[in-house]
Amino acid sequence: AGYLHTGLDRYEVFDFQEDGLGELESFIKSKKLPFSFHVPFFRPSYFPYTGVTTFFLNDDPEKRALSFKLIDSTMHYANKWSADFVVTHLTWKDDSLDRKKVMDLTSYTKSKFCDLADRYKLPINIEFGGYSGHFHEPEQFVDFVKDHSSLGICIDIGHTSLISGIRNRNFFRDIEIMAPHTKSIHVWNTKGLEHNKKHNHVPVHPSQKAEDGWVDIKKTLEIILGYNKDCNIIFEYNHTYYDNIPDEVQEGMEWVKEIVNKK
């Protein structure tokens, strides 16, 4: 894939190939803005899966080891490039179906993440997920991060909305539970699962109304920022724009900036 996501006065790097790293590094250095790395920073040949794949809660110990190797590599480069934090997924559709095993693996993963955060002196934000499997409740993610100052939650607004729909939960209640522990936000919009399959991550825009089926971005941001106004905000869209951001996309970014500045 290879995405450089624009944020509010920052960037996030995700899933580059090695041959694109030169251009990426010179762009990042020229901007002199803070940036984060989303695991994998780049996808090495030993990981022949998609960038969003994680095996931390998988039954296969060899696959689990691969995911730990990948996050370690991303942390190494994040430290070297002076990124200010790392974002990782925790759950995936191939997670173990054994509930007790998932809880044991989660506990083990948490201790490994704490060690990594301490070793590299870098915070880790765990992106909320859970379309399937036993680890999908906001409270579970809060428990995962709350005892270590370097761990926090990344609320992905689009995914959180889709998951609350699948799980028959109240979206804003889910947001409320996680907000006090949230350190970063992935911002994009959707009208639901079918819409998402067709359009993927739609750039936010003030013209998107909740009554038309869109996620209420303003209300969502206001809840999260009410607990932590310093959350890092990333626009997680389907394109790497570098400096060529389309006008409509830019309008949405400015709108979010206004919402943030009012908090």
Indicate residue ranges for each PLM-predicted region.
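Acidic-and-aromatic substrate-binding clefts and catalytic sites of carbohydrate-active enzymes
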Residues: 1, 10-26, 93-98, 131-137, ...
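Hydrophobic faces of well-ordered beta-strands that scaffold small-molecule active sites
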Residues: 9-13, 35-40, 86-88, 124-126, ...
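Surface-exposed, active-site-proximal loop segments in enzymatic domains
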Residues: 44-66, 90-102, 196-207, 248
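Active-site acidic/histidine proton-transfer and metal-coordination neighborhood
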Residues: 56-152
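Alpha-helix-loop-beta-strand connector modules within alpha/beta enzyme cores
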Residues: 29-44, 107-119, 147-148, 212-222
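Surface-exposed alpha-helical segments enriched in charged/polar residues
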Residues: 4-5, 22-29, 72, 76-79, ...
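Histidine-acidic metal/acid-base catalytic patches
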Residues: 2, 83-84, 142, 147-154, ...
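N-terminal pre-domain/capping segments
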Residues: 1-73, 79, 152, 258-263
